[in-house]
From Swiss-Prot:
One of its GO terms (molecular function) is 1-(5-phosphoribosyl)-5-[(5-phosphoribosylamino)methylideneamino]imidazole-4-carboxamide isomerase activity. This is 1-(5-phosphoribosyl)-5-[(5-phosphoribosylamino)methylideneamino] imidazole-4-carboxamide isomerase. Pathway: Amino-acid biosynthesis; L-histidine biosynthesis; L-histidine from 5-phospho-alpha-D-ribose 1-diphosphate: step 4/9. InterPro entries: Aldolase_TIM, His_biosynth, HisA_bact_arch, Isoase_HisA-like, Isoase_HisA-like_bact, RibuloseP-bd_barrel. Pfam families: His_biosynth (PF00977). It comes from Wolinella succinogenes (strain ATCC 29543 / DSM 1740 / CCUG 13145 / JCM 31913 / LMG 7466 / NCTC 11488 / FDC 602W) (Vibrio succinogenes).
Length: 240
């Protein structure tokens, strides 16, 4: 089970949203690169970054902050938010991003995702409201079921699936384990849970869910619900 801390970027600052609403943004740091460095010191191996402005704009909007984060740490980085074309993917890969997250474009142009997965390390981000896929910074909800989209990529060489129940995101109410496991089973891929993690006690339960291999830690860390340093030490030796 991979424990992945998250940094969501809005206008160069590290923030957290509630249920994907930009107006709910709470600022946690003006220096996201310092956060990244601290996550590495605590024992993290991966870092999850979302360019929130980019997710709404459909193009990179926090490039300088992302570059500084990359320069400040040796963590592996997965990044999403507004990535719609190969030129942007190349730009991030050249910057040193290890895994590219494709979200909105996965619903709107799955053939593009399949093509990119043959060339780059790609994760598909499946974000859902009431079981249906949401896109464009979660501002749009389509008619595609999340499990159907996951199944569509079953034979595609993806690096991971990252799934979020938007109704749980940023609420500290607990991750929707049933939804996460359904996505994992439908896709057959390494699956990372996201949205609503409330406490350390949830993590062993997620680890027991078939096909769920990682979890993203966001607001639970920033609000002091989870001590990442202690968690990494506790899990070493019993969870990979």
């Amino acid at each position: 089970m991979e424990i992945i801390p998250a940094i969501d970027l809005k206008e160069g600052q590290a923030v957290r949203l509630t249920k994907g609403l930009m107006e709910s943004a709470k600022i946690y740091s003006d220096e996201p690169w310092r956060l990244a460095k601290s996550f590495e010191e605590l024992g993290a191996k991966w870092l999850h970054i979302v360019d929130l402005n980019g997710a709404f704009a459909g193009e990179p909007k926090n490039l300088e902050s992302i570059r500084k984060i990359r320069e400040s740490c040796n963590l592996k980085i997965e990044l999403g938010g507004g990535i719609r074309d190969e030129a942007t993917i190349k730009r991030y890969v050249e910057l040193g991003v290890d895994r590219i997250i494709l979200g909105s474009v996965a619903m709107k142009n799955p053939e593009f995702v399949k093509e990119m997965a043959s060339r780059y390390k790609i994760a598909v981000g499946i974000d859902a409201k009431e079981g249906y896929v949401a896109a464009e910074g979660w501002a749009e909800t389509g008619k595609v079921k999340a499990t159907e989209l996951a199944a569509l990529f079953r034979e595609v060489p993806l690096d991971a699936i990252i799934c979020t129940d938007i109704s749980k995101d940023g609420t500290l109410e607990g991750i929707n384990r049933e939804f996460t496991q359904a996505i994992a089973e439908a896709s057959g891929h390494y699956t990372i849970a996201s949205g609503g993690l409330a406490s350390e006690e949830e993590i062993p339960l997620l680890a027991q869910a078939k096909g769920v291999d990682g979890v993203i830690v966001g607001k639970a860390f920033y609000e002091g619900r989870i001590d990442l340093g202690t968690l990494y030490k506790r899990l070493s030796g019993c969870l990979n």
